Amino acid sequence: SKDKNPILIICSYNPAAHQTSVTISDYMEEYGKLGGQRDIIIENMNCKSFSEAPLWSGMMTQILSKYQGEKHPGQIILLGQEAWAAYLSQRDSMQIKVPVMCSLASSNIVILPKDTVKNLDSWMPESVDIFADHMDIPELESGFINQYDIEGNIRMLRTFYPKTEHIAFISDNTYGGVTMQALVRKEMEKFPDLDLILMDGRKHTIYTIVEELRHLPENTVIMVGTWRVDMNEGYFMRNATYAMMEATPAIPAFTPSSVSLGSWAIGGVLPDYRKVGKEMAQESVRMDSQPGDTAKHLSVIGCKAVLDSRKVKEWGLNPKVLPFDVQLINQPVSFYQQYTYQIWSACALFVILVLGLCISLFYYFRTKRLRDELLKSEKDLRVA
């Protein structure tokens, strides 16, 4: 609609990236179905490794400067951790505050570094929580925010491995990796008896991290945070975590983020991830229809405990010892579940064959009886 200010979606990554693409397409489809009237504009920050972090605030300012004055957006949607952090880093300079929604983001953030920060690879920022630290963001009207439960993961791994003395935390060279590492450092202060070993992708390649993993001390448990980009800014898929797994066959691994779950990690306490595109569209329509609503409609995506049943069996663990409920994934499928369709097809075929046999036998005996009666009648007539 030409007379309405547009909705501006600012993505951290290329909109063609799977999670971003699914979220945007679900959002646009649902927004259209709900009768949304605004045009939708998509801008992409194309964030990669953490070495670019000092530039993101300027990129956000540049994007927003294109939509000033009469062209200012009716809503701003921030997709991804980097876009969310970049917005927070420069929101004070914005002349017009429009309603903001964040998604694919988490409650724990780190304030983006300034250009003056030297040695980003060894920079140890403080973890800030938008709820616990009471950040004042009046224009944030809606959001879908993941919360990570590091304490829950430590409780899980200590229940299974009470002799644990060291936790090796793996994080990569991305904003997500740095924020999760900052959260782990903050949460580990609650466990002074545990030693935290940081396996930091800002300082490691996949090859050097594998070498470090081979030399971990006894009574260590690995916590896999995230691994997508290493210090050389090379991108990795699942094969990287397989290489790490092969280097540490005798060390158990857990994950607070679902990375390596199903291949390497035994389990973890992780956000109950779900598709939120449709819910975002409903929120956009609500924000338009209720402009006077000043309440924050923030949907916090809580955590659930998950264990890979194949890994549980492989490591000889008993999920019942955990002090909380747990969801088992990759459970072995029974013969009936695996071949339900074939079993029912075979049963149906058997029933049809039995019915066919019964009908054939009925007509066979009926015909035989009639023939016998005819022969008897013929015999009686001859006698007469």
Where are each of the predicted segments found?
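An alpha-beta-alpha
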Residues: 7, 131-188, 297-309
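Periplasmic-binding protein-like
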Residues: 9-10, 68-80, 99-103, 166-171, ...
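Short, well-structured alpha-helical segments in soluble
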Residues: 52-74, 89-93, 210-219
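Hydrophobic alpha-helical segments within soluble ligand-binding/sensing domains
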Residues: 108-113, 118-134, 142-164, 272-289
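Membrane-proximal low-complexity regions enriched in glycine and acidic/polar residues
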Residues: 186, 194-295
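Hinge/cleft segment of the Venus flytrap/periplasmic-binding protein
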Residues: 287-348
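Alpha-helical transmembrane signal-anchor helices
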Residues: 330-374
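PAS/LOV and related PAS-like sensory modules
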Residues: 374-384
